[in-house]
């Protein structure tokens, strides 16, 4: 999964340097149970180190910010865009696509409303304006960015079926329940991909390169 992060950074660099590339979007899954650490997280709890030593999790650092994210059973997206929108506006454009796409599948999402504070250990332990929560108040999608030279990389994790036991071991909190959709992750990704292409004119995205390889 270190290669995934390198590929995402390479996509950002290509978006910056190549005038033909406006935006890239990739979807992928993680093999095994991985915990990604936000770029600005300085320390990790001792019990995480113990879980790593015991082989219960793997740990990698993301180039994007935010708190720690457990990648297991969900969907990751990585989007790069060659625009210098204000950060809030860039999150809003992406989230509007996600809200519309999941509404079409029967899942209603809304913006988080927690105030920004110091980085919380668990990304999914708080819901900011950059995040999306479901109708029952569970955070379903957490997103974070890296901004560089007039472009940005946005990572997002869509929690569809997180492992409850491992989640509690890591965060000492209950995991969100399995998402109430009778679809596989592959089917969700296909819908997101099609929805993005269909509505790109409404969200100011064009010249899109999409790769949903796992």
Predicted regions and their residues:
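Short beta-strand-to-loop capping motifs
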Residues: 39, 79-83, 134, 160
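Short, conserved charged micro-motifs
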Residues: 45-47, 85-90, 166-168
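Residues forming anionic-ligand binding surfaces in small-molecule and nucleic-acid pockets
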Residues: 63-81, 169-175
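Aromatic/basic-lined ligand-recognition segments
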Residues: 127-133, 137-145
């Amino acid at each position: 999964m270190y290669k995934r992060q390198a590929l995402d950074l390479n996509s950002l660099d290509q978006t910056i340097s190549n005038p033909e590339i406006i935006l890239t979007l990739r979807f992928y899954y993680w093999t095994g149970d991985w915990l990604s650490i936000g770029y600005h997280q300085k320390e990790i709890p001792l019990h995480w180190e113990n879980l790593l030593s015991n082989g219960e999790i793997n740990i990698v650092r993301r180039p994007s910010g935010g708190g720690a994210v457990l990648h297991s059973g969900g969907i990751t997206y990585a989007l790069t865009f060659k625009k210098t929108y204000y950060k809030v506006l860039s999150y809003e454009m992406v989230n509007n696509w996600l809200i519309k796409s999941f509404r079409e599948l029967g899942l209603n999402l809304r913006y988080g409303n927690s105030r920004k504070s110091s980085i919380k250990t668990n990304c999914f332990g708080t819901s900011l304006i950059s995040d999306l929560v479901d109708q029952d108040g569970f955070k379903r999608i957490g997103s974070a960015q890296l901004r560089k030279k007039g472009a940005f990389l946005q990572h997002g994790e869509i929690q569809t079926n997180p492992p409850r036991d491992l989640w509690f071991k890591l965060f000492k909190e209950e995991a969100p329940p399995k998402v109430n959709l009778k679809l596989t992750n592959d089917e969700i990704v296909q819908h997101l991909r099609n929805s993005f292409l269909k509505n790109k004119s409404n969200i100011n995205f064009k010249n899109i390169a999409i790769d949903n390889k796992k």
